Amino acid sequence: MSDNGGLAAESYWRDGKLHIQNHPLNSGKGSTYEGGIREPMIVSWPGVVKPGSKCDNYLLIEDFYPSILEMAGIKKYKTVQPIDGISFIPLLKQTGNPSKGRSLFWNMPNNWGNDGPGINF
């Protein structure tokens, strides 16, 4: 195992075990399969997020910036470039799904080879 989850990238760090730590999700760290991209998020925001609530919708790391701006009540701000993210506050408040119909895509220029972490091409 690597120091921060998933199987280590270097073959001499590995103990030969396949990706099973994310079962039943397919694959793990470094993969675009669900086991490599799906991470839990725990939120506590008294008066806004209902205790014990659960949301299965997705969001991206880019969504945190506009969400934090909205949480802080900042409506007018200048940026050097357009903001890529979408505020996920409607998901927290259970008032809507800003990700509905949103396409996700990744560029993975470095594919794993036959000695990769439990994956053979």
Predicted regions and their residues:
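Active-site glycine-centered loops adjacent to acidic/histidine catalytic or metal-binding residues
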Residues: 3
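C-terminal cap/loop subdomain of S1 sulfatases and analogous C-terminal strand-loop tails that border
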Residues: 6-12, 16-32, 49-53, 57, ...
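Ligand-binding/active-site lining segments
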Residues: 35
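Catalytic cores of eukaryotic secretory-pathway lumenal/extracellular enzymes that build
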Residues: 38-39
